[in-house]
Amino acid sequence: MRKLIIEPLTKEAFAPFGDVIETDGSDHFMINNGSTMRFHRLAEVQTAQPDDKAIISIFRAEALPMPLTIGMLERHPQGSQAFIPLLGNPFLIVVAPVGDAPESELTRAFVSNGRQGVNYHRGVWHHPVLTIEKRDDFLVVDRSGEGNNCDEHYFAESQLLVLDPNPLEG
């Protein structure tokens, strides 16, 4: 099994998979008579059909035991999906490029600093939300509409990956 190297989450490194949602280094302008700084258009919600709706949900995630064997990734072919941490905790991100199936050797792992969210572009393979904390809440922006919007791919045993965040503690 290949051990995933956990990279810091940056806009440049994550660009092939989607958007990093953060205020650091982002364009902004003042609104509300100068009392509010608006960080505008940090990501775009992607939908496939004219009748699709962008919806907002909250996911409450439970931590999985680590190290974690990554045996499955999912994708949303009908729309993007964004995760914004609500409690300020770092979280893990596992992604693979758009394609008919995720390629184990192209799969990458990132860690958010807790002030960064991610917006997976339509069709990007990713692991379901991975909190480091025992329990964590995320604001989720994704698509509601007709048709299947979640494909799952299970890796063959020879393609399994290992995610171990413990080096972050040292």
Curated annotation (Swiss-Prot):
Alphabetized, the UniProt keywords read: Lyase, Purine metabolism
Would you kindly state one Gene Ontology biological process term found in this protein's UniProt entry? purine nucleobase catabolic process
Question: Needs which cofactor?
Answer: Ni(2+)
Q: Respond yes or no to whether keyword Lyase is given for this record.
A: yes
Q: What is its EC number?
A: 4.3.2.3
State if RNA-binding is listed as a keyword.
no
The organism's place on the tree of life at top rank: Bacteria
Q: What class of enzyme is it?
A: lyase
Pathway it belongs to?
Answer: Nitrogen metabolism; (S)-allantoin degradation
Supply one GO molecular-function term: ureidoglycolate hydrolase activity
Which Pfam families does the entry link to? Ureidogly_lyase
Show the NCBIfam families listed in the entry: PRK03606.1-2, PRK13395.1
Cited function: Catalyzes the catabolism of the allantoin degradation intermediate (S)-ureidoglycolate, generating urea and glyoxylate. Involved in the utilization of allantoin as nitrogen source.
Assigned protein family: Belongs to the ureidoglycolate lyase family.
Protein name in the entry: Ureidoglycolate lyase
Source organism of this protein record: Pseudomonas savastanoi pv. phaseolicola (strain 1448A / Race 6)
Gene from which the chain derives: allA
